[in-house]
Amino acid sequence: MLNENDSRNTVARAYADHIDNPRVKAPVLFGNMKQTWHQFVVRAEDRDAFRSYMEVNGVGTDIHYATPAHKQPCYRHMRHGELPVTERLADEVVSLPIAHPITPDDAIAIAGIINRY
């Protein structure tokens, strides 16, 4: 049986290999790259509509870190100025399910739903 990190890497690879929709950008995985995959984050310019579509199709999504770090109350005093790319990305990010019990076959099925979006 795969350990949790191996399982998440396998699921992440399934997502990355099967998501093929220009409206939803998945991370690019290089070679045998491995990480812990605490989250599998994609980008969708129309995030709210995408999340609604996923929900209607039975796939839960989440938004982690919706507020960019420079806009967090504890950092306001630092006056970072405008960070338009950071703010745009914060408005686009969506986390897909990756933790157990999600399997590679589940990820491929979810990718199919994403590809029909």
Predicted regions: what they are:
Residues M1-Y117:
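PLP-dependent aminotransferase class I/II
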